[in-house]
Amino acid sequence: MIDLTPNPEQMRDSARRCAEEGIVVPTFAQMKDPSLVPQSVRDELREIGLWDVHPRNLFRITWKNEPIPRGGGFGGVNYVELPSSLTGVDARIIALVGKWFPTGAHKVGATFGCIAPRLVTGQFNPVTQKAVWPSTGNYCRGGAYVAALLGCESIAILPEGMSRERFEWLERVAGEVIATPGCESNVKEIFDKCWELRATREDIVIFNQFEEFGNH
């Protein structure tokens, strides 16, 4: 289960940061059913691009975004059905499409599910702590993006062999990017770096996707 033990002092810091940055944190119910999103937020989204680093894009962490790059509202689930001529089986196979999430990857939802409970309970302090996102790919990308929307600083950790585009994007969004030895298969090296950070820094919270209930 997710630990919801409150830390009132740090909750006040979170509330103050949200007020300063104009951040409105959506509920999980609103993400599941965007018809619950207030009209005022929908109006703002008409002027915001899907990938913009803007706090209202927190409301676009849903499978039900209108499939356009800017100004979109909400609709049905984005999916494609794979034809039998391609799959070779009679069963209907439907694939969900992550392209129309902010960042073009559905892991923004997983990372929000990890950091949001810590923020609202005060277990993570956006004023004094940094969120660490160890990953070989989209979890790291999603975490840095969601943290930026929530007014939090991030440390992204990923293998040096990942694409140059990924590093360049993270350098614009995350406060710090750490490259570890190897490529996508070198997961151990990522978590070796996490242990090193735990031993040398006091202002971090590591969001390990393999142990975070919010990722599942």
PLM region spans:
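PLP-dependent amino-acid enzyme catalytic core
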Residues: 1-216
